[in-house]
């Protein structure tokens, strides 16, 4: 179909008109940085300062996407959500509760399923693109 025949907007499942202006382009987003650190009792090594640029939150509140930056350190993680990750920069090691480890480097793409428990260790300052889905009891 020629571009001239494509409708400029469509209706979403919620009946809201969605158009090209609804697209969230991370490179153009002007999202405020959220700075934080894990709770002290969860930190095992270093001072893992972290910054999130949460560029998108779904209207239902179950999905978000953005960019995460982490400084060297190791802390406990307990995922209640499903998270797709793409490492854009740096090196991290993800370990499960049994001590099994996976080294994560720039270019790696993976999903951490809800229920995963273990540690995240940043060896070299890390940048991660993420998409998070938090299921409810009905989804």
Q: How does the language model describe each region?
A:
Residues 99-114:
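Short acidic-glycine-tyrosine-enriched beta hairpin
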Residues 65-67, 84, 109-111:
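Conserved hydrophobic/aromatic beta-strand scaffold that supports enzyme active sites
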Residues 61-79:
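Conserved short histidine dyad/triad with adjacent acidic residue
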Residues 80-94:
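Short, conserved beta-strand element in jelly-roll/cupin
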Residues 95-97, 121:
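A generic structural motif
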Residues 77, 94, 128-130:
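Short hydrophobic/aromatic-rich beta-strand segments that constitute the beta-sheet cores
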Residues 2-62:
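A short, N-terminal "cap"/entry segment at the start of jelly-roll beta-barrel domains
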Residues 114-137:
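Ligand-binding loop in jelly-roll beta-barrel domains
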């Amino acid at each position: 179909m020629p571009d001239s025949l494509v409708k400029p907007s469509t209706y979403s499942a919620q009946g809201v008109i969605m158009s090209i202006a609804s697209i969230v382009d991370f490179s153009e987003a002007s999202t405020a940085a959220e700075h934080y650190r894990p709770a002290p009792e969860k930190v095992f090594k270093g001072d893992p300062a972290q910054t999130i640029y949460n560029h998108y939150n779904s209207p239902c509140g179950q999905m978000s996407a953005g960019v995460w930056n982490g400084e060297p350190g190791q802390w406990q993680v307990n995922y209640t959500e499903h998270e797709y990750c793409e490492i854009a920069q740096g090196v991290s090691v993800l370990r499960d509760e049994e001590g099994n480890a996976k080294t994560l480097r720039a270019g790696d793409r993976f999903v951490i399923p809800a229920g995963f428990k273990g540690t995240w260790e940043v060896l070299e300052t890390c940048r991660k693109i993420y998409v998070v889905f938090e299921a409810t009891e009905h989804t």
